[in-house]
A protein has these predicted regions:
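Active-site and substrate-binding clefts of carbohydrate-active enzymes
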Residues: 113-114, 119-123, 142, 160-358
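Short, charged, surface-exposed secondary-structure boundary motifs
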Residues: 45-47, 105-113, 135-136, 218
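Catalytic domains of cell-wall/extracellular-matrix polysaccharide-remodeling enzymes
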Residues: 57-112, 178-192
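Generic structural signal for well-ordered alpha-helices
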Residues: 20-24, 53-60, 86, 156-159, ...
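Alpha-helical scaffold elements lining the catalytic groove of polysaccharide deacetylases
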Residues: 42-65, 122, 127-163, 182-185, ...
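Acidic, His- and aromatic-enriched active-site or binding-groove loops in soluble protein domains
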Residues: 19-36, 69, 90-111, 115-127
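Active-site beta->alpha N-cap acidic-glycine motif
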Residues: 1-28
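Intrinsically disordered, polybasic Lys/Arg-rich low-complexity tracts
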Residues: 358-409
Length: 409
Protein backbone atom coordinates (compact mmCIF):
# COMPACT_ATOMS: atom_id res chain seq x y z
CA UNK A 1 0.00 0.00 0.00
CA UNK A 2 1.03 3.60 -0.54
CA UNK A 3 -0.03 6.72 1.32
CA UNK A 4 0.65 10.05 -0.41
CA UNK A 5 -0.63 13.39 0.87
CA UNK A 6 -2.75 15.66 -1.32
CA UNK A 7 -0.06 18.36 -1.22
CA UNK A 8 2.54 15.84 -2.45
CA UNK A 9 0.22 14.75 -5.27
CA UNK A 10 -0.26 18.39 -6.29
CA UNK A 11 3.52 18.85 -6.49
CA UNK A 12 3.94 15.65 -8.50
CA UNK A 13 1.23 16.72 -10.94
CA UNK A 14 3.08 19.99 -11.57
CA UNK A 15 6.75 18.97 -11.41
CA UNK A 16 6.89 15.19 -11.98
CA UNK A 17 3.87 13.98 -13.98
CA UNK A 18 5.84 10.85 -14.94
CA UNK A 19 5.56 9.72 -11.30
CA UNK A 20 1.78 10.11 -11.48
CA UNK A 21 1.84 7.83 -14.55
CA UNK A 22 3.81 5.23 -12.57
CA UNK A 23 1.29 5.43 -9.72
CA UNK A 24 -1.52 4.78 -12.20
CA UNK A 25 0.38 1.76 -13.50
CA UNK A 26 0.66 0.45 -9.94
CA UNK A 27 -3.04 1.05 -9.41
CA UNK A 28 -3.87 -0.87 -12.60
CA UNK A 29 -2.14 -4.01 -11.27
CA UNK A 30 -4.84 -4.39 -8.62
CA UNK A 31 -2.10 -5.37 -6.16
CA UNK A 32 -1.45 -1.90 -4.71
CA UNK A 33 -3.80 -0.07 -2.38
CA UNK A 34 -3.80 3.71 -1.90
CA UNK A 35 -4.55 4.82 1.66
CA UNK A 36 -6.07 8.04 2.96
CA UNK A 37 -4.28 10.54 5.19
CA UNK A 38 -4.56 14.27 6.08
CA UNK A 39 -4.34 16.34 2.88
CA UNK A 40 -1.49 18.47 4.25
CA UNK A 41 0.31 15.64 6.07
CA UNK A 42 -0.17 17.86 9.10
CA UNK A 43 -1.08 17.66 12.78
CA UNK A 44 -4.70 18.83 12.65
CA UNK A 45 -5.80 15.65 14.47
CA UNK A 46 -4.06 17.08 17.55
CA UNK A 47 -5.57 20.55 17.24
CA UNK A 48 -8.91 21.01 15.53
CA UNK A 49 -11.58 18.40 14.76
CA UNK A 50 -13.23 20.44 11.98
CA UNK A 51 -9.91 21.01 10.19
CA UNK A 52 -9.01 17.35 10.55
CA UNK A 53 -12.32 16.17 9.11
CA UNK A 54 -12.19 18.66 6.25
CA UNK A 55 -8.75 17.69 5.04
CA UNK A 56 -9.30 13.95 5.46
CA UNK A 57 -12.48 14.10 3.38
CA UNK A 58 -10.72 16.30 0.81
CA UNK A 59 -7.90 13.76 0.58
CA UNK A 60 -10.40 10.92 0.17
CA UNK A 61 -12.04 12.78 -2.73
CA UNK A 62 -8.60 13.42 -4.27
CA UNK A 63 -7.67 9.74 -4.14
CA UNK A 64 -10.99 8.66 -5.63
CA UNK A 65 -10.65 11.24 -8.41
CA UNK A 66 -7.08 10.13 -9.25
CA UNK A 67 -7.31 6.37 -8.82
CA UNK A 68 -11.02 5.61 -9.16
CA UNK A 69 -11.36 4.05 -5.69
CA UNK A 70 -12.42 5.50 -2.37
CA UNK A 71 -9.86 4.58 0.33
CA UNK A 72 -11.18 2.34 3.10
CA UNK A 73 -8.08 2.40 5.31
CA UNK A 74 -6.58 5.49 6.95
CA UNK A 75 -3.12 6.33 8.19
CA UNK A 76 -2.48 9.54 10.07
CA UNK A 77 0.66 11.65 9.65
CA UNK A 78 3.56 9.66 11.18
CA UNK A 79 0.98 7.07 12.33
CA UNK A 80 -0.28 9.42 15.09
CA UNK A 81 -3.14 7.70 16.93
CA UNK A 82 -5.22 7.90 20.09
CA UNK A 83 -8.63 6.59 21.14
CA UNK A 84 -10.21 9.95 20.29
CA UNK A 85 -8.56 10.12 16.86
CA UNK A 86 -9.66 6.56 16.15
CA UNK A 87 -13.26 7.50 16.97
CA UNK A 88 -13.11 10.44 14.54
CA UNK A 89 -11.64 8.28 11.78
CA UNK A 90 -14.33 5.63 12.29
CA UNK A 91 -17.07 8.29 12.13
CA UNK A 92 -15.87 9.16 8.62
CA UNK A 93 -16.55 5.61 7.43
CA UNK A 94 -13.07 4.07 7.43
CA UNK A 95 -12.80 0.34 8.15
CA UNK A 96 -9.17 0.23 9.23
CA UNK A 97 -6.28 2.38 10.42
CA UNK A 98 -2.51 1.95 10.58
CA UNK A 99 -0.60 2.88 13.72
CA UNK A 100 2.52 2.09 15.73
CA UNK A 101 3.04 -1.12 17.70
CA UNK A 102 4.46 0.89 20.59
CA UNK A 103 5.72 -1.08 23.60
CA UNK A 104 4.23 1.30 26.17
CA UNK A 105 0.78 0.69 24.65
CA UNK A 106 0.99 -3.03 23.84
CA UNK A 107 2.80 -4.18 26.97
CA UNK A 108 3.00 -7.99 26.70
CA UNK A 109 0.79 -8.09 23.58
CA UNK A 110 2.16 -8.74 20.09
CA UNK A 111 1.75 -6.32 17.16
CA UNK A 112 1.18 -9.35 14.90
CA UNK A 113 -2.60 -9.43 15.40
CA UNK A 114 -5.52 -7.25 14.35
CA UNK A 115 -6.89 -5.00 17.12
CA UNK A 116 -9.75 -2.47 17.21
CA UNK A 117 -10.40 1.05 18.49
CA UNK A 118 -11.92 1.10 21.97
CA UNK A 119 -14.30 3.93 20.99
CA UNK A 120 -15.35 2.31 17.70
CA UNK A 121 -15.08 -1.50 17.47
CA UNK A 122 -15.78 -1.32 13.73
CA UNK A 123 -12.37 0.37 13.17
CA UNK A 124 -9.69 -2.31 12.97
CA UNK A 125 -6.09 -1.40 13.78
CA UNK A 126 -2.96 -2.67 12.03
CA UNK A 127 0.14 -2.20 14.19
CA UNK A 128 3.61 -1.64 12.79
CA UNK A 129 6.37 -4.08 13.74
CA UNK A 130 8.92 -1.35 14.45
CA UNK A 131 11.91 -3.71 14.67
CA UNK A 132 11.36 -5.39 11.29
CA UNK A 133 10.41 -2.06 9.72
CA UNK A 134 13.44 -0.19 11.06
CA UNK A 135 15.77 -3.03 10.06
CA UNK A 136 15.07 -1.95 6.49
CA UNK A 137 14.42 1.78 6.80
CA UNK A 138 17.08 2.71 9.40
CA UNK A 139 19.69 -0.06 9.74
CA UNK A 140 19.95 -1.69 6.32
CA UNK A 141 23.18 0.03 5.19
CA UNK A 142 24.72 0.47 8.67
CA UNK A 143 27.97 -1.50 8.57
CA UNK A 144 28.21 -1.35 12.40
CA UNK A 145 24.91 -3.23 12.77
CA UNK A 146 25.31 -6.82 14.00
CA UNK A 147 23.06 -8.15 11.22
CA UNK A 148 24.85 -6.29 8.42
CA UNK A 149 24.71 -7.13 5.57
CA UNK A 150 21.01 -8.01 5.49
CA UNK A 151 19.84 -10.33 2.72
CA UNK A 152 16.27 -11.13 1.71
CA UNK A 153 16.43 -14.81 2.72
CA UNK A 154 17.68 -13.94 6.23
CA UNK A 155 14.93 -11.34 6.66
CA UNK A 156 12.20 -13.78 5.56
CA UNK A 157 13.62 -16.42 7.94
CA UNK A 158 13.09 -14.00 10.84
CA UNK A 159 9.42 -13.78 9.87
CA UNK A 160 9.12 -17.52 9.26
CA UNK A 161 10.22 -18.47 12.79
CA UNK A 162 7.56 -16.30 14.45
CA UNK A 163 4.75 -18.23 16.21
CA UNK A 164 2.31 -19.76 13.70
CA UNK A 165 -0.69 -18.00 15.25
CA UNK A 166 0.87 -14.57 14.62
CA UNK A 167 -0.56 -14.06 11.16
CA UNK A 168 0.00 -10.35 10.41
CA UNK A 169 3.43 -8.74 10.18
CA UNK A 170 3.08 -5.05 9.26
CA UNK A 171 6.13 -3.41 7.68
CA UNK A 172 5.56 0.37 7.45
CA UNK A 173 8.25 2.88 6.50
CA UNK A 174 8.78 6.21 4.80
CA UNK A 175 9.34 6.09 1.05
CA UNK A 176 12.44 8.24 1.62
CA UNK A 177 14.10 5.11 3.06
CA UNK A 178 14.53 3.90 -0.51
CA UNK A 179 17.28 6.04 -1.97
CA UNK A 180 17.71 8.66 0.75
CA UNK A 181 18.04 7.12 4.22
CA UNK A 182 19.32 4.00 2.47
CA UNK A 183 21.31 4.99 -0.63
CA UNK A 184 20.77 3.07 -3.85
CA UNK A 185 24.41 1.98 -3.65
CA UNK A 186 23.44 -0.16 -0.63
CA UNK A 187 21.43 -2.42 -3.00
CA UNK A 188 18.21 -1.68 -1.10
CA UNK A 189 16.13 -2.06 -4.27
CA UNK A 190 17.69 -5.44 -5.10
CA UNK A 191 16.85 -6.55 -1.55
CA UNK A 192 13.20 -5.61 -2.02
CA UNK A 193 13.02 -7.31 -5.42
CA UNK A 194 14.27 -10.57 -3.86
CA UNK A 195 11.76 -10.55 -0.97
CA UNK A 196 8.68 -11.95 -2.81
CA UNK A 197 10.53 -15.03 -4.12
CA UNK A 198 12.06 -15.77 -0.71
CA UNK A 199 8.65 -15.31 0.93
CA UNK A 200 6.96 -17.61 -1.60
CA UNK A 201 9.48 -20.36 -0.82
CA UNK A 202 8.40 -20.20 2.85
CA UNK A 203 4.67 -20.01 2.11
CA UNK A 204 4.47 -16.37 3.23
CA UNK A 205 2.07 -14.15 1.29
CA UNK A 206 1.52 -10.41 0.87
CA UNK A 207 -1.82 -8.64 1.43
CA UNK A 208 -3.23 -5.13 1.20
CA UNK A 209 -4.50 -3.46 4.41
CA UNK A 210 -8.11 -3.71 3.21
CA UNK A 211 -7.72 -7.46 2.61
CA UNK A 212 -6.44 -7.87 6.18
CA UNK A 213 -9.17 -5.85 7.90
CA UNK A 214 -11.81 -7.60 5.79
CA UNK A 215 -10.64 -11.19 6.33
CA UNK A 216 -9.31 -11.19 9.90
CA UNK A 217 -11.14 -10.60 13.15
CA UNK A 218 -9.88 -8.37 15.93
CA UNK A 219 -8.46 -10.18 18.96
CA UNK A 220 -8.86 -7.25 21.37
CA UNK A 221 -9.41 -3.53 21.74
CA UNK A 222 -6.40 -1.23 21.99
CA UNK A 223 -6.41 1.43 24.72
CA UNK A 224 -4.48 4.57 23.73
CA UNK A 225 -5.59 7.51 25.91
CA UNK A 226 -2.71 9.75 24.77
CA UNK A 227 -1.47 10.27 21.19
CA UNK A 228 1.34 8.01 20.03
CA UNK A 229 3.36 8.00 16.80
CA UNK A 230 6.16 6.06 15.12
CA UNK A 231 8.81 8.71 15.83
CA UNK A 232 11.74 8.48 18.26
CA UNK A 233 12.15 6.14 21.21
CA UNK A 234 9.23 7.72 23.11
CA UNK A 235 6.78 7.02 20.25
CA UNK A 236 4.83 10.16 21.18
CA UNK A 237 4.27 13.65 19.68
CA UNK A 238 7.22 15.38 21.40
CA UNK A 239 9.15 15.49 18.13
CA UNK A 240 6.68 18.15 16.90
CA UNK A 241 5.35 19.70 20.11
CA UNK A 242 8.05 18.99 22.68
CA UNK A 243 9.48 22.47 23.20
CA UNK A 244 8.24 26.03 23.71
CA UNK A 245 9.09 27.10 20.16
CA UNK A 246 7.05 24.32 18.60
CA UNK A 247 4.03 24.86 20.84
CA UNK A 248 4.10 28.62 20.23
CA UNK A 249 4.12 28.12 16.45
CA UNK A 250 1.49 25.37 16.61
CA UNK A 251 -0.93 27.35 18.80
CA UNK A 252 -0.54 30.51 16.73
CA UNK A 253 -1.22 28.60 13.51
CA UNK A 254 -4.43 27.02 14.75
CA UNK A 255 -5.62 30.25 16.39
CA UNK A 256 -6.88 31.27 12.93
CA UNK A 257 -8.15 27.81 11.97
CA UNK A 258 -11.82 28.75 12.19
CA UNK A 259 -11.40 31.82 9.97
CA UNK A 260 -9.42 29.86 7.40
CA UNK A 261 -12.05 27.13 7.50
CA UNK A 262 -14.71 29.74 6.64
CA UNK A 263 -12.64 31.24 3.83
CA UNK A 264 -13.14 30.40 0.16
CA UNK A 265 -9.94 32.17 -0.97
CA UNK A 266 -7.92 29.61 -2.99
CA UNK A 267 -4.48 31.02 -2.11
CA UNK A 268 -5.32 31.22 1.59
CA UNK A 269 -6.40 27.57 1.52
CA UNK A 270 -3.27 26.50 -0.36
CA UNK A 271 -0.88 28.28 2.01
CA UNK A 272 -2.82 26.88 4.96
CA UNK A 273 -2.05 23.37 3.69
CA UNK A 274 1.65 24.22 3.35
CA UNK A 275 1.84 25.76 6.83
CA UNK A 276 0.23 22.71 8.44
CA UNK A 277 2.83 20.22 7.13
CA UNK A 278 4.29 18.34 10.10
CA UNK A 279 7.92 18.85 9.01
CA UNK A 280 7.57 22.59 9.72
CA UNK A 281 7.40 21.67 13.42
CA UNK A 282 9.84 18.76 13.23
CA UNK A 283 12.53 21.14 11.98
CA UNK A 284 12.17 23.05 15.29
CA UNK A 285 12.86 20.09 17.58
CA UNK A 286 15.67 20.41 20.11
CA UNK A 287 15.61 16.71 21.04
CA UNK A 288 18.87 14.78 20.82
CA UNK A 289 17.79 11.37 19.57
CA UNK A 290 21.14 10.09 18.35
CA UNK A 291 19.61 9.67 14.89
CA UNK A 292 20.46 12.08 12.09
CA UNK A 293 17.63 14.53 11.44
CA UNK A 294 17.08 16.25 8.13
CA UNK A 295 16.30 19.89 8.96
CA UNK A 296 15.75 20.84 5.35
CA UNK A 297 17.18 24.27 4.56
CA UNK A 298 17.77 25.19 8.23
CA UNK A 299 20.97 25.04 10.27
CA UNK A 300 19.21 25.00 13.64
CA UNK A 301 15.76 24.74 15.24
CA UNK A 302 15.90 28.48 15.93
CA UNK A 303 16.38 29.30 12.25
CA UNK A 304 13.41 27.08 11.45
CA UNK A 305 11.26 28.78 14.10
CA UNK A 306 12.20 32.33 13.04
CA UNK A 307 11.50 31.71 9.38
CA UNK A 308 8.23 29.91 10.06
CA UNK A 309 6.93 32.64 12.38
CA UNK A 310 7.73 35.34 9.80
CA UNK A 311 5.77 33.48 7.14
CA UNK A 312 2.95 32.68 9.57
CA UNK A 313 2.72 36.34 10.64
CA UNK A 314 2.29 37.42 7.02
CA UNK A 315 -0.32 34.70 6.50
CA UNK A 316 -2.34 35.80 9.54
CA UNK A 317 -2.32 39.42 8.27
CA UNK A 318 -3.84 38.18 5.00
CA UNK A 319 -6.49 36.22 6.87
CA UNK A 320 -7.31 39.23 9.06
CA UNK A 321 -7.64 41.45 5.98
CA UNK A 322 -10.48 39.16 4.87
CA UNK A 323 -11.97 38.60 8.31
CA UNK A 324 -10.92 41.34 10.79
CA UNK A 325 -9.86 40.31 14.29
CA UNK A 326 -12.40 42.66 15.90
CA UNK A 327 -15.24 40.62 14.40
CA UNK A 328 -16.20 37.84 16.78
CA UNK A 329 -15.78 34.37 15.27
CA UNK A 330 -19.35 33.37 16.12
CA UNK A 331 -20.70 36.58 14.59
CA UNK A 332 -18.54 36.06 11.51
CA UNK A 333 -19.66 32.46 11.24
CA UNK A 334 -23.30 33.56 11.50
CA UNK A 335 -22.86 36.19 8.77
CA UNK A 336 -21.08 33.79 6.43
CA UNK A 337 -23.72 31.12 7.08
CA UNK A 338 -26.45 33.64 6.19
CA UNK A 339 -24.61 34.59 2.99
CA UNK A 340 -24.13 30.92 2.13
CA UNK A 341 -27.81 30.17 2.78
CA UNK A 342 -28.86 33.07 0.56
CA UNK A 343 -26.47 31.82 -2.09
CA UNK A 344 -27.92 28.31 -1.83
CA UNK A 345 -31.43 29.75 -2.06
CA UNK A 346 -30.52 31.75 -5.18
CA UNK A 347 -28.96 28.63 -6.72
CA UNK A 348 -32.13 26.63 -6.04
CA UNK A 349 -34.31 29.39 -7.53
CA UNK A 350 -32.08 29.53 -10.60
CA UNK A 351 -32.47 25.77 -10.99
CA UNK A 352 -36.25 26.13 -10.66
CA UNK A 353 -36.33 28.92 -13.27
CA UNK A 354 -34.20 26.81 -15.63
CA UNK A 355 -36.55 23.88 -15.09
CA UNK A 356 -39.65 25.97 -15.94
CA UNK A 357 -37.87 27.51 -18.94
CA UNK A 358 -37.05 24.06 -20.27
CA UNK A 359 -40.65 22.96 -19.72
CA UNK A 360 -42.01 26.08 -21.47
CA UNK A 361 -39.66 25.57 -24.43
CA UNK A 362 -40.77 21.95 -24.67
CA UNK A 363 -44.46 22.91 -24.63
CA UNK A 364 -43.88 25.64 -27.27
CA UNK A 365 -42.07 23.16 -29.49
CA UNK A 366 -44.92 20.66 -29.06
CA UNK A 367 -47.52 23.30 -30.02
CA UNK A 368 -45.55 24.27 -33.14
CA UNK A 369 -45.35 20.62 -34.19
CA UNK A 370 -49.12 20.17 -33.64
CA UNK A 371 -49.91 23.35 -35.64
CA UNK A 372 -47.75 22.14 -38.52
CA UNK A 373 -49.63 18.84 -38.64
CA UNK A 374 -53.01 20.66 -38.80
CA UNK A 375 -51.81 22.85 -41.70
CA UNK A 376 -50.58 19.80 -43.62
CA UNK A 377 -53.91 18.05 -43.03
CA UNK A 378 -55.89 21.08 -44.36
CA UNK A 379 -53.72 21.22 -47.46
CA UNK A 380 -54.50 17.57 -48.12
CA UNK A 381 -58.26 18.23 -47.87
CA UNK A 382 -58.05 21.25 -50.18
CA UNK A 383 -56.13 19.26 -52.80
CA UNK A 384 -58.75 16.51 -52.83
CA UNK A 385 -61.75 18.90 -53.36
CA UNK A 386 -61.26 19.58 -57.15
CA UNK A 387 -61.34 15.85 -57.84
CA UNK A 388 -64.57 15.54 -55.91
CA UNK A 389 -66.09 18.47 -57.84
CA UNK A 390 -65.05 16.93 -61.18
CA UNK A 391 -66.69 13.65 -60.25
CA UNK A 392 -69.88 15.44 -59.22
CA UNK A 393 -69.94 17.48 -62.49
CA UNK A 394 -69.38 14.32 -64.56
CA UNK A 395 -72.19 12.51 -62.77
CA UNK A 396 -74.56 15.50 -63.36
CA UNK A 397 -73.66 15.63 -67.06
CA UNK A 398 -74.23 11.89 -67.44
CA UNK A 399 -77.59 12.22 -65.66
CA UNK A 400 -78.61 14.98 -68.05
CA UNK A 401 -77.63 12.87 -71.08
CA UNK A 402 -79.64 9.96 -69.75
CA UNK A 403 -82.68 12.16 -69.26
CA UNK A 404 -82.25 13.54 -72.80
CA UNK A 405 -82.19 10.02 -74.24
CA UNK A 406 -85.27 9.11 -72.28
CA UNK A 407 -87.18 12.07 -73.65
CA UNK A 408 -86.26 11.21 -77.25
CA UNK A 409 -87.51 7.70 -76.78
Amino acid sequence: ALSISGVALEQLEIHAPAVIDLLHQLNDTGCCEFLCEPYSHGLSSLANEDCFREEVLRQRDKMKQMFGKEPKVFRNSSLIYSDEIGGLVASMGFKGMLTEGAKHVLGWKSPHYVYHCNQAPSLKLLLRDFKLSDDISLRFSNSDWAEYPLFADKYINWIDVLPQEEQVINIFMELSALGMAQPLSSNILEFLKALPECARAKGITFSTPTEIVTKLKSVSQLDVPYPMSWVDEERDTSSWLGNVLQREAFNKLYSVAERVHLSDDRRIKQDWDYLQASNNFRFMTTKNTGIWLNRGIYDSPYDAFTNYMNILGDFIKRVNSLYPEDVDSEELNSLLTTIKNHGDEITELQKEVAKWQAKAEKETAAKKTAAKKVVVAKESVVKKEPTAKKSATKKTAESKKAVGRAKKT
